[in-house]
Amino acid sequence: MQTYRSRMHLVCSLGLFLTLLHLSNSLLLGAFNIKSFGDTKASNATLMNIITKIVKRYDVILIQEVRDSDLSATQTLMNYVNKDSPQYKYIVSEPLGASTYKERYLFLYREALVSVVKSYTYDDGPEETGQDTFSREPFVVMFSSKNTAVRDFTLIPQHTSPDLAVRELNALYDVVLDVRARWNTNDIVLLGDFNAGCSYVSGSAWQQIRIFTDKTFHWLITDAADTTVSQTVCPYDRIVVTTDMMRGVVQNSAKVYNYMTDLNLKQDLALAVSDHFPVEVKLS
């Protein structure tokens, strides 16, 4: 009996060890629209301390609505997140946009856990003629991780224009096809402020979006989610993965991170940080 109990104890201990090992090998991926992130916000220490806490929650995070032509605000953010120890590196797009209003896509990542393999900006047509598809074309990045089931995974970020959300979300299907042809991979995550809900995408409009109608795409942040800090209830921010990528996703780990509640902030301060909550998922 004692031998049996000892064996069972060993089995349970081994199971716990493997579970903890599995969790320690997971990556937390996030996407956060930090409203108008530029020098004004970067000069506010109160807001930057909150943003730093949010960013350091993640191993890889996409930051959107980066209004930073000379990357001075980005460098300020890097100084904050690396203050205690130099853990994070970044890769950033060029300023993107068909008009004088431009934004960057910014990825921060823990260099001890992941590295950038390659990147490119999707070519959606000539902006001068107004024939381009996206207001802010995706800046596609492939990351490599030694500790996850999917070693190399590709992130396709998108911050849609609200009034063009249906068209731009549908066009993401073409971006996926381009990534597959260019890099011979189908381990793909689409993420960002899709404006995919409430009045911007509703009813029959969903049937016009191929990454929704094609069931080889999995919407991990559902229509029931609320990604807005204000009183509205809208699932604007999303994470969508391909079937192949699902093998690297921790089941039921995708969620909205409510930093207002978690950091015990009043709503006006939370709104000063952003009008969006981050969305996240664990990769293992």
Curated annotation (Swiss-Prot):
One of its GO terms (cellular component) is zymogen granule. Disulfide bonds join 198-234. It is an enzyme of class 3 (hydrolase). The record marks 92 as: Involved in actin-binding. One of its GO terms (biological process) is regulation of neutrophil mediated cytotoxicity. It catalyses: Endonucleolytic cleavage to 5'-phosphodinucleotide and 5'-phosphooligonucleotide end-products. Divalent metal cations. Prefers Ca(2+) or Mg(2+) which have a synergistic effect on activation. Gene3D superfamilies: Endonuclease/exonuclease/phosphatase. Its cofactor is Ca(2+); Mg(2+). The active site is at residues 103, 159. Belongs to the DNase I family. Serum endocuclease secreted into body fluids by a wide variety of exocrine and endocrine organs. Expressed by non-hematopoietic tissues and preferentially cleaves protein-free DNA. Among other functions, seems to be involved in cell death by apoptosis. Binds specifically to G-actin and blocks actin polymerization. Preferentially attacks double-stranded DNA and produces oligonucleotides with 5'-phospho and 3'-hydroxy termini. This is Deoxyribonuclease-1. The gene is dnase1.
